[in-house]
Swiss-Prot record:
Keyword Magnesium in annotation: yes
Active site: E204, K337
Originating gene: eno2
Name this protein carries in UniProt: Enolase 2
One Gene Ontology CC term in the entry: extracellular region
Protein location: Cytoplasm; Secreted; Cell surface
Keyword Secreted on entry: yes
Keywords from the named record: Cytoplasm, Glycolysis, Lyase, Magnesium, Metal-binding, Secreted
Residues that, per the record, bind Mg(2+): D241, E285, D312
E.C. designation(s): 4.2.1.11
Amino acid sequence: MTVYVEKVRALEIFDSRGNPTVEVHAYLSDGTVAKAEVPSGASTGEKEAVELRDGGNRLQGKGVTQAVTNVNGPINDALKGLSPYNQAEIDRTMIKLDGTLNKAKLGANAILGTSMAIARAAARSKDEPLYRYLGGCELEMPQTFHNVINGGKHADNGIDIQEFMITPVAKNSFRDGFEKIVNTYHALKAVIEEAGFETGLGDEGGFAPNLNSSEEALKMLRKAIIKAGYKPRKDIAIAFDAAASSFYNTEDGKYHFEGHIWNGEEMLQYYDKLLKEFPEIISCEDPFDENDWENFEKFTAKFGSTHQVVADDNVCTNPKLVRKAIKDKLCNSILIKLNQIGTITETLETIRLARKNNMTTMVSHRSGETGDTFIADFTVATNAGQLKSGAPARSERVEKYNRLLEIENQIGVENERLNHFPNNVDFD
């Protein structure tokens, strides 16, 4: 029996920040139904694919009814009758239908939701876990990064660096590493309370104490790691996402950072001091504005041999921009966000390109999340190696980690079979 896409239907739902987003249901001819929910970001790169919003007064202009209409109308009409097992054909059909360079006509939220829903339906139709359907064999669990102190656009406090993350370095399994993170997270709460600060949470489940500096946040992290019974860097390491575009002033070309107004060279000197003071930092993301490639390149030239330097806002999971980053030696790692580019196929192209050029990759959630666990399966399927999905708190974050625990258990039980399992999905 030939299985084909019977229809796709969308509706407007809400994400973890109370903003509207798109949910898509895919219906196959064999009776299979699957859904996907699309996340959205607070700190977004200018080169990201367009997230179609309605504008106007309703829901602060953030409604997505036009994106929903696009799924239910032209996207549905274009995909009816296609094989759900040929992901590349599904995605390229939508890209061609949209006809713009940034998916501005149909909306990346409409296109991605459909891309994900059909992939999940195809896996379900074959009675396979999504990670196995997408990845086939030789699957590995990822290193996870957890945003436990939120600043920047993710919190209302005095810290300009957006994310302070911890990652388990010494671990016997994903579960073992995650338990270390949970222990450190609870120790951090105690450290913050002992210092007299509130322990309210930011968008990504991390604490958002009203600290005065990034150094203060890093000292708290170090103290929490030790309090939890671990050794900084040896057991638990630290990473940060500066999201520097959020504190870069385009009018004067300076970085307005925690009471200072610095040029690129002064910002570089600050990072140099910070990394020397905190050797437990192993990964740095977006240390400069997305258009400040010159200083980004200088940062990588200076620290790239000892630290992971992750590019996000300046490449936006876009293969064309990643090629330029490779040529210019901008970074040594690429952040992967499916909704920045808008289809599974293009995201896979970016991962392959980075890996071919000896770059690491890190799959990422967004600050406006849903309970959808697609990225957990996707990270394992692609052997991306790294995932960041927020703190071990707030259900929309923890759902991803719980899914990884399930996957680890399944891989452990079925490892011998998985090593010989064919890849059933066509991405070419």
